[in-house]
């Protein structure tokens, strides 16, 4: 498996930047290419928000996973739309955060990704080295196929709580996004959790909006940016953990020097975690 993944990685085109690697490049990680780093540098010439926002997003995801593992006792995670998954410091991984914060030794993580470049990179750099991690080719817009994937069905225990982190709602139109959230909340076992990350232009200064829109248009085809009210609508009826739907730096900050703490809206992303009854 490792040799095949590495061969596939070698055949990938790397001339164009993609958001799944830009996030890593902006956070100082190693799972990116020159095109991604060039775009981050170009964007930082306009505003330094790219690097700090990337840090804020990764720190949020790390806190969510850490809380669910350490406090809620979750030992199964499905991370949907993960790109090349990282933790808050360059090169660290979200499944490592789960393992380090869980009181148990057998935390299982399934990454689901549809972008072929991100998928192959993750398969080459994660699966060969981690027995309790799987990387699955899946598209949240094809819910039956994603949930019915043999790895998803057998690697995770669907009789026990699962934490699903939905990181790609920005790729869905309103009707599809509502359907996906509804399907996920009814598919997972009782006592599971649904975490959400969603990009927004709320709080983006008017003079920076064209640059932000331009970068995102280059890297996120089919982008659906939502306001706080629109994101809240996706979560309607769900029991949100405190502090509810907030800017990602505001979700259970744990001290230290969190990115975007002085201006949470500069993170450009909302986050929330819901308990599934």
Task: Give the ranges of each region predicted by the language model.
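Rossmann-like AdoMet
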Residues: 1-138, 142-158, 185, 268
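A short, conserved alpha-helix within the catalytic core of class I
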Residues: 143-148, 171-183
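Short SAM/SAH-binding signature in class I
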Residues: 156-170
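Conserved beta-strand signature within the Rossmann-like core of class I S-adenosyl-L-methionine
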Residues: 163-166, 187-199
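Short "lid" loop at the C-terminus of a central beta-strand within the Rossmann-like core
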Residues: 169-172, 199-203
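Short, glycine-/aromatic-enriched active-site segment of Class I SAM-dependent methyltransferases
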Residues: 205-219
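Short alpha-helix
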Residues: 221-245
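Core SAM-dependent methyltransferase catalytic element
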Residues: 244, 250-277
């Amino acid at each position: 498996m490792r040799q095949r993944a590495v061969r596939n990685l070698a055949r990938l085109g790397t001339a164009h930047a993609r958001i799944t690697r830009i996030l890593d490049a902006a956070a100082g990680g190693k799972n990116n290419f020159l095109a991604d780093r060039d775009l981050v540098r170009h964007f930082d010439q306009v505003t330094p928000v790219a690097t700090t926002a990337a840090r804020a997003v990764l720190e949020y995801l790390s806190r969510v996973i850490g809380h669910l593992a350490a406090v809620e006792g979750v030992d199964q995670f499905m991370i949907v739309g993960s790109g090349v998954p990282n933790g808050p410091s360059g090169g660290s991984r979200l499944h490592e955060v789960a393992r380090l914060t869980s009181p148990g030794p057998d935390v299982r993580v399934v990454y689901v990704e549809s972008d072929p470049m991100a998928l192959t990179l993750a398969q080459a750099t994660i699966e060969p080295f981690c027995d309790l991690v799987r990387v699955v080719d899946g598209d949240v817009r094809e819910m039956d196929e994603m949930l019915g994937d043999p790895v998803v069905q057998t690697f995770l225990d669907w009789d026990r709580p699962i934490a699903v982190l939905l990181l790609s709602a920005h790729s869905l139109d309103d009707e599809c996004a509502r359907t996906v959230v509804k399907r996920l909340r009814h598919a997972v076992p009782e006592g599971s959790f649904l975490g959400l990350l969603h990009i927004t232009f709320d709080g983006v200064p008017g003079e920076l909006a064209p640059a932000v829109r331009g970068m995102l248009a280059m890297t996120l085809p089919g982008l659906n940016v939502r306001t706080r009210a629109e994101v809240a609508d996706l979560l309607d009826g769900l029991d949100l953990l405190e502090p509810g739907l907030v800017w990602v730096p505001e979700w259970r900050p744990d001290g230290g020097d969190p990115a975007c703490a002085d201006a949470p809206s500069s993170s450009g992303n909302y986050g929330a975690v819901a308990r599934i009854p």
